[in-house]
Amino acid sequence: MQTSPLLENLIESLRCLPGVGPKSAQRMAYHLLQRDRSGGMNLARALTEAMSKIGHCEHCRTFTEEDICSICDNPRRQNSRLLCVVEMPADIQAIEQTGQFSGRYFVLMGHLSPLDGIGPREIGLDLLQRRLQQEQFNEVILATNPTVEGDATANYIAELCNQQNIKVSRIAHGIPVGGELETVDGTTLTHSFLGRRTIG
């Protein structure tokens, strides 16, 4: 049976989402068309608006509709001498929910992965280095994921910090090896922050 080109395009477009294969995309498309057209229209509007209006914070690189995000724009945060480096914006959300950190952030938007062509510049380490030189941080907390790539990224950043005599630590126990911050519960993440250790 020949299907509608518009339907095929919808199914194919839904496959761009992580973990969504052909069957899942097809189920989603049929659900929206059969049972939830208003939800589909709301989704389309929200996607269009988000894609056109959400950019990156000029200071920390997280997602925001403004030039500077609400965390970086907070006067209490601006005086903090603690900088937490994370891989993704979702990691900030996870850390903020613990209430254990009141410093500033820097988002890498990934991790070092030479085999995939992702080097220091691709994850903004040149911007991080400039920020470390321009601002007076007492400590940099590395909250990269406990993966091989996360470890390599943390070690690289630790070297940058050591060159500038900035104390550097990494969140420690509680996060499973191979896990990702955005999926860890708040209690575990709290223990990880309290148990961070110095590197170098």
Curated annotation (Swiss-Prot):
Domain of life of the native organism: Bacteria
Zinc finger (C4-type) in chain: 57-72
Molecular function terms, GO-annotated: DNA binding; zinc ion binding
PROSITE patterns per the UniProt record, alphabetical: RECR, TOPRIM
InterPro entries: DNA_Rcmb_RecR, Rcmb_RecR, Rcmb_RecR_Znf, TOPRIM_dom, TOPRIM_RecR
Gene Ontology biological-process annotations: DNA recombination; DNA repair
Pfam annotation, one family: Toprim_4
Keywords attached to this entry: DNA damage, DNA recombination, DNA repair, Metal-binding, Zinc, Zinc-finger
Function comment: May play a role in DNA repair. It seems to be involved in an RecBC-independent recombinational process of DNA repair. It may act with RecF and RecO.
Name of the protein in question: Recombination protein RecR
Gene this protein is translated from: recR
